[in-house]
Amino acid sequence: MQAKVSWQKKMHFVGRGDSGHEVHLDAKKEIGGEDLGARPMELLLMGLGGCTGIDIVMILDKMRIAYDRVDVLLDAKRAPNPPEKFTEITLTYEIDAIDADVDKVIRAVKLSQEKYCSASHSLSATLSAVVVVNGQKVYDDRANLPE
């Protein structure tokens, strides 16, 4: 896999990967950016959410679980000093499923986190999961709830 990020002006860059799609990146105005794109750390977080989200949809489809909504909310904590890397990331999976087998939905999330999501395996931050099915929290590995 390859990507190229090209400077445009000030702190604005345009990235393009093997897929050919462009992504605009920029810094906040306070440090010289013009707010013309997402921040690099936001993209890292969105990439993680997209990676695990795609896994979840594929796994739910294979399990023949129908769903109306799959949202992945990511809450990241960063170190206070440079390089201000992510130290903890909580992923909350909000899934509206029709006649859902909650255990299978939790299994789909665990498979993504433990086996399939290459983005999560590329990060050194501590990751934790919360699963919400049809508006009800059914799993939270931060609270050591029963699996």
Give short role names for the model-derived ranges.
Residues 1-46, 57-147:
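Extended beta-strand/beta-hairpin segments
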